Amino acid sequence: MGQSHGAMVTAVIDQGIGFSATADLSPEGLQQAADHAYALAQLTRRTGLYADLTQDDILAKPVKTFQWQTAIEHISRNRRPWMDFLQDEANSIKSTSELVYWEVGLTEDISEHTIWIDGELISDQKFVHLMPYTVATVCVNGITQTRHLGGHSSPWCQQGGDDALERMDIQGSLACAFGDALALAKAPTCPTMRGALILMPDQMLMQIHESIGHPLELDRILGDERNYAGTSFVSLDMFGSYQYGSEHLTVRFDPGTNPETRNEFASYACDDMGSQAENKILIDQGRLVRPLGGRLSAKRAHKRGYPVDFVANARASGWDRPPIDRMANINIDPGTASFADLIRSVDHGVLMTTNVSWSIDDSRNKFQFGCELGYEIRSGKVQGLVRNPGYRGVSASFWKSLSMVGDTSTFAVLGTPNCGKGEPNQGARVGHASPACRFDDVEIFSTAS
């Protein structure tokens, strides 16, 4: 258990912005930070990075105060029931010669963010984030397999209290992970082929994150991240015309504006520069509409001759980091196909779930992903479990192969606390909600080969 308090003081002048963090919240400490931020703003003006941008371009004062409170139906400060639940989960499987390791855990993070501009309260937001975790590893005849329920990237993360645990439905997850791991250790390896690929929502989380979310970050497109996190195959001239995916692909920035996503992991009322968070489409039936860029990044793009729209995604990981363009809740709209429809549509292919490994180039284009669990499908029927399934592709063409999108019965609201970006590094919470999806003519292989 840890606590942290502090403030990030921002100074804005014409053609310049400066940030200075302090844990000293006394008037003297805040004044010292303000003086430092102002000096840095003068330095950035001399770099020309914000040339021709006025104070209002850089930071516009909102006309209202934004408030957010994680929607919690019932929560108690008594954590004994949570501890009892975790202990019961840990005791749900018995130690055997095959069981190598197991773990079950739950992390709760409570935070409050306030924004003041020119002495006026702009935003007061309170969040409760829950992050459960379950893993079991077995070794059978020299073959080791690990199964996460909650996933390698903890995709069950949501906002909420006791109600969030009920929505996650994780009771019995450790026993399920143990059973899956045993079955995987005895299963054949994934076949090497080109064929249909069905991705379940917890793997769609990683696919969305790496090959839609990161490439669309506007500061990356502007070149800010090339020294650390890389660039993007997306360029400013693509917005409004480029066909990013098939007509089945609609992707939106959703800061929790719908009942289904109200408790998604990165829901909020405004970003950390005071911009109102609104539901906006990023990709509309395959066509690239707008980037993942905050107001300041959009103004910089305008000065280059590209009048792109912005979303409220200027986010900081904490009081000691400046806001930068980040993913928040990046979601794919459901389609009309049931899970049975998806399976029946496949002549030969593999269904994959739960990411275990990932690799993608620094322009977020060529990628390779490995999953924990796969099912081979032939003639519209599931044939059986396969282990070490993997697939590879190219973002610029992969989403064009999207041929079917699952309906709301296949839709899951997920999230991860593990998005890293920025110098110095910032770890951000992001949400990804998606149905199951089918892709055609994908290169499939065994990651153990």
Task: Describe each PLM feature range.
Residues 32-125, 160-202, 341:
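Acidic low-complexity segments
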Residues 1-42:
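N-terminal alpha-helical targeting/anchoring segments
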Residues 198-210, 275:
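Extracytoplasmic assembly/pore-lining segments of large envelope/extracellular complexes
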Residues 1-7, 99-123, 344-370:
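Structured beta-strand/loop patches that form or line metal/cofactor-binding pockets in enzymes
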